[in-house]
């Protein structure tokens, strides 16, 4: 039962949960397609993960174990506030270990630890429309998706190559899902894009401000857009994580002092802790 009296389990009323679950089913049936839903007011402002919170509230059960991360970290403001919110309105167990979680809500990262078929990962999405900055009119972008007119996206990537010699997009890198819809993977770094391809876990995306839900079912093909002569590549670092020594995880740059000294550490705090423990054994 919920710890906070006076509220329904997971805050949302059951009719709203059913409405969101129907939208999820449609999104799973049409991978990458943006499904409108009647978003509700949540006890936090838009831009702080209201879309992801509504998805989590609709799928979480009393036996689930919840993990919430923000930019890969478990201890940042957004992650802590959302985790405490669900602890109060559901009473479910929470964890910082990716392996132990059944539901993972994330802002802007995919965990380094591979996910399994028993897990659901829920992304907080600020702007669900990948064509928004090319064509701002929603009526036009819906038509472009329907007709599969994605040439303008390829032109945008080509303009990067013409200006910089490479595709300069480093986050929210557009992907094609199941060979059909171009999708915004949320502002995850492009380093995480390959993890989405054939992932065993169900991937759900919620945009609270724009009231859109979309999904990538388990074991679905997800391809990052590129060109034959400019294939998709991920970021590389010249040095390992300063804490655990990992050479194959996404690293954050941390400035140490006013002299400009800096170090690189794993963005995923749980993965970094696991690597450190394994190294010390």
Curated annotation (Swiss-Prot):
Signal peptide annotation: none
The keyword Lyase belongs to this UniProt entry's keyword annotation: yes
Free-text comment on the cofactor: Binds 1 [4Fe-4S] cluster per subunit.
Reaction equations catalysed: alpha-D-ribose 1-methylphosphonate 5-phosphate + AH2 + S-adenosyl-L-methionine = alpha-D-ribose 1,2-cyclic phosphate 5-phosphate + methane + 5'-deoxyadenosine + L-methionine + A + H(+)
GO molecular function annotations of the record: 4 iron, 4 sulfur cluster binding; alpha-D-ribose 1-methylphosphonate 5-phosphate C-P-lyase activity; lyase activity; metal ion binding
GO cellular component: a single term: alpha-D-ribose 1-methylphosphonate 5-triphosphate synthase complex
BP term (GO), one: organic phosphonate catabolic process
Cofactor dependence: [4Fe-4S] cluster
Database matches in InterPro entries: PhnJ
Keyword tags: 4Fe-4S, Iron, Iron-sulfur, Lyase, Metal-binding, S-adenosyl-L-methionine
The enzyme's E.C. designation: 4.7.1.1
Family to which this protein belongs: Belongs to the PhnJ family.
Subunit and partners: Forms a complex with PhnG, PhnH, PhnI and PhnK with the suggested composition PhnG(4)H(2)I(2)J(2)K.
Note: The sequence shown is that of strain K12.
Function: Catalyzes the breakage of the C-P bond in alpha-D-ribose 1-methylphosphonate 5-phosphate (PRPn) forming alpha-D-ribose 1,2-cyclic phosphate 5-phosphate (PRcP).
Name listed for the protein in its UniProt record: Alpha-D-ribose 1-methylphosphonate 5-phosphate C-P lyase
Gene: phnJ
């Amino acid at each position: 039962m919920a710890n906070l009296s006076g509220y329904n389990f997971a805050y949302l009323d059951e009719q709203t949960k059913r409405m969101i679950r129907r939208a999820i089913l449609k999104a799973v049936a049409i991978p990458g397609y943006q499904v409108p839903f009647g978003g509700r007011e949540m006890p936090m402002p838009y831009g702080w993960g209201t879309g992801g919170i509504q998805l989590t509230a609709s799928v979480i059960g009393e036996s689930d174990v919840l993990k919430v991360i923000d930019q890969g970290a478990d201890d940042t403001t957004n992650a802590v506030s959302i985790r405490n919110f669900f602890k109060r309105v559901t009473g479910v167990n929470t964890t910082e270990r990716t392996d132990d979680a059944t539901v993972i809500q994330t802002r802007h990262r995919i965990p380094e630890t591979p996910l399994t078929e028993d897990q659901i990962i829920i992304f907080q999405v600020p702007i669900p429309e990948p064509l928004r900055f090319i064509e701002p009119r929603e009526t036009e972008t819906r038509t472009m998706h329907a007709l599969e007119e994605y040439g303008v996206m390829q032109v945008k990537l080509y303009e990067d190559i013409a200006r910089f010699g490479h595709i300069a997009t480093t986050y929210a890198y557009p992907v094609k899902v199941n060979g059909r819809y171009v999708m915004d993977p949320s502002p995850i770094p492009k380093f995480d894009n390959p993890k989405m391809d054939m992932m065993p876990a169900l991937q759900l995306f919620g945009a609270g401000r724009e009231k859109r839900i979309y999904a990538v079912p388990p074991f679905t093909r997800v391809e990052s857009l590129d060109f034959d002569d400019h294939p998709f590549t991920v970021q590389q670092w010249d040095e390992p994580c300063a804490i655990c020594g990992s050479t194959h995880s996404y690293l954050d740059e941390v400035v140490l002092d006013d002299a400009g000294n800096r170090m690189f550490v794993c963005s995923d705090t749980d993965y970094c802790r696991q690597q450190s423990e394994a190294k010390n054994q």
